[in-house]
Amino acid sequence: MHGLLLAGLLALPSNVLGHPAEPPNSVNVTHRHIDTSAYFLPQLSLYNKSEDVAEYGGDNITGSSYSGGDHSASNLSSEDYVTVATSLLKATLPYASFRLIDDHYIGDSGIGHVHFRQTVYGIDIDNTDFNVNVGRDGKVFSYGSSFYEGEIPKANPVAKRDFSDPVNALIGAINTLNIPVTAAVGEVKTTPIEGNSTYMFKGTTGALTDPTAQLVYLQKDGGLHLTWRVETDVGDNWLLTYVDAKKNDQVHGVVDYVASAEYQVYPWGVNDPTDGERAHLYFPWFKTGSRNWHIDGRGWHTTTRGNNAIAQDNPSGGWEYEDNHRPTNPLLIFRYPYTQSMTPPASYRDASITQLFYTGNVYHDLLYILGFNEKAGNFQVNNWGKGGKGNDFTILNTQDGSGVNNANFATPPDGQPGRMRMYVWDTSTPYRDGSFEAGIVIHEYTHGVSNRLTGGPANSRCLSSLESGGMGEGWSDFFATVVHLKERDTRNKNYTIGEWASGRQGGIRKYPYSTDLHTNPLMYVDADGLESVHAIGTIWCTILNEVLWNLIERHGMGNVNKIKPTFKDGVPTDGRNLAMKLVLDGMALQPCLPNFVQARDAIIDADMNLTKGANRCELWKAFAKRGLGVGAAYNPEKRVGSSRVPGGC
């Protein structure tokens, strides 16, 4: 079993930074979310960017030779790039034992991505990852590592049976985190699954699926800790709890797959009901990204269900969705009334379901064209033989009764469905439905993207430290901002998140996203002392907003009324789509549990691969403006800022 990430939209601005105070917090967030902030995994990753690899000769490790060329994935063979990656790992850490994770793929930018997990006595060290990016020339492009290099236990704990019963670990996790699952010694039975000391628990109540436990090591505080990785999915949280294998009241770390956010149809580019009018759209899917939104290779659906998503209301807030209400029309005509004055929300549920289904599908198709496809771990029932694991469309719940004034997205590994919950907001009269604010929907969906790309599709645990989790929130805000740019926008325009749904002028972040340092003064070093992923994410999105506008000013905005990007030689021709492409490619390049500096380097590497570094100076100037220039350094207590750019810029 694997971990899952639950990410959420909402963190209301508060006095978390040393800047002028906010207006009083007037939004009451209610949900059943478990606070795991005390159990972030440690930040351990190193990233060797492309210029470092070239300087120290790592790029001389190659597979069988072939000629370079365009961005086509056919330039690499699977045997070659996996062999190259394996050779690098063996050369870099010759004494480490490891296993190849079965999620390697060649992205549409031509880079092969390979991921490894370190093992000891055949037991995974769960937070050790080695990712290798192999270029189109068959050489190592860049790589990252969080492999453990300390002392190894002298004996195999499985042979000695030197650990507790997994039932005790389950109870320890439940008691420590107050997980709403009932399990009693004597009533819960364990069933071995998958080998490698993995068990399923029968006889519990409260979880969506039977909990599991796997014996793994966790790297922490300079040593290895033998733990039971207990997996419990209770809807608002889908947790991997690392319980000490001997002291079951001690928890070493927690991963939550669920990510919460703040947020006939409003067309793409219309952020909310104040931003434009509803329209009747016909056949809106891209054939490149979807054959049709209502087929999945198994049948034709005359409701809001298809290969990419299944959308329904969920007023009970429960876990089941198959039998929930969806609008149905044999001609696929989904026209339902909605105005902002309508109340209660249930009176316009069909309009809400249709809007959520539309927004989720369009975003799926756009991301597909930008590189988040089957091989990269996207969300589809049927992958049409193109790689990756299927059976994982996105479950889209609107008017979800499990909370208000928020939204969330659960991201399990590739092959298991993502789950989005959109809530009603009670901060205005009449209440507002978050599914009608596209920025919230896109924010949530992007949690699924960043978690699938970072560390590989099979590993949803790679944004589980404080800083990487914060960047997850920042990426989500960034994409939510980019997709509703208007033709006449300039870098002088400010952007907000959640303003319509919350009814709060200025939205739900501490500052609007602005390139004006007076309007938004956030710098890299402002992350010092922050304990909220949303506050950290606001800094990261602020930095990415500088990247966006530097690229737009060089390459233009493009046609904002055209959803599908235009490419030349595999590169988006406008700055808006180029920014999204580089950020997505950077996610796939960066190591598991990245920090700001590593993510910056990965974006610059993405440009080096895609354009041969044509935008190097635009990128460095953007990062440097917010203190993430040459010489900036990560330290969780005292980050080092820098406004320097490289020579030649």
Swiss-Prot record:
The active site is at E444. Residues 1-18 form the signal peptide. Its EC number is 3.4.24.-. Keywords: Glycoprotein, Hydrolase, Metal-binding, Metalloprotease, Protease, Secreted, Signal, Virulence, Zinc, Zymogen. Its cofactor is Zn(2+). One of its GO terms (biological process) is proteolysis. It is found in: Secreted. One of its GO terms (cellular component) is extracellular region. GO terms for molecular function: metalloendopeptidase activity; zinc ion binding. Glycans are attached at N494, N609. Zn(2+) binds at H443, H447. Binds 1 zinc ion per subunit. Belongs to the peptidase M36 family. This is Extracellular metalloproteinase 4. It comes from Arthroderma otae (strain ATCC MYA-4605 / CBS 113480).
